[in-house]
Amino acid sequence: MAGHKSIKRIIHRCAEEIDATRRISKVTSFKEGLETFRAKIDIQIMNRNGYYENETRKNHLLRKHDIMIRYYEKTFGDFLKTYDYDHKNKKLPKSEYADCIWVCWWQGLEQAPELVKVCVDSIKRNAGNHRVIILTDDNYKQYVDIPKWVEEKRNKGIISRTHYSDILRLSLLAQHGGMWIDSTFFCTGIGLQEYFKASLWSIKRPDYFHASIAAGYFANYSFACNQEHRWIFKVILDFLLEYWKENDIMTDYLFLDYLIVLVQKYDSQIAEEFKNIKSNNPECDELYKIMGEKFNENKWNELKKNTCLFKLSWKYQYPKEKDGIPTFYGMLVDNKLN
């Protein structure tokens, strides 16, 4: 049965990508539509080979990003020219949640996998005086206002839970500020508190893999801003809501990254703020790659030397031991990784 569901999902995803290619081709050209499809195949290959990126693959991805930005420019049309980019100078009311760390697990932590629980505990442990608010299906409306039409599209299945999370994230940051980090971040130090001192923050590893147009210059699962810079996320949110107001389908899974780059193209002040984010957490993805390996204290000390946030995934099964020796995963879930 599991295999049958997996095959059905693969067929469904292939159909989605073929339809996306058709829509891109109508706006750009047939040749460019095929180029984006080829780049998506490259991404799937990279997902399975440890994200090895040779020069040919990199060029395919960069070409895709160029095509997709032009595609979205045509999709947004006059909105890009008529949008009021000066609204950032209007003062936003102060929020009582400005110092909060926002973490979302829709079903509630009681239903979360062990890895997620450990990660959230690590965030709380290193949050200092910052409140950690766990958002769920039952409580998120207490903290944020989302347009009714968005809720209706979500209930109809037009906006998926993943893309609804994008709207939630941007809405929280636009309305309150504070920090949003994914529930699968394992935090090892007080560096988390330091990021609140910046006007704008995101994990930043310049010239990282090019599967996303972000290429390490930002990571949309990790954002923070102070009260005075909430307008940055208000602009990005306005763009995102405009897209969903006019469209009922997503052309690219990494749309939010394209959107953030598009906003920077049309708003030089936002581009400057992103440029000013200091590089941080260079080893963010490295713990994930060795979760099933035998724990090695020297390797662990080396990883956390200049990184305090490690992005993990709850979707994979890891052994707790290997040849009688605890793995990195085993140390993590036994709360011995610190």
Model-identified regions with their sequence ranges:
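Glycosyltransferase-associated regions of secretory-pathway enzymes
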Residues: A2-S165, F186-N338
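Small-residue hinge/turn detector
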Residues: D166-H176
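Active-site acidic Asp-centered loop
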Residues: H176, I181-S183
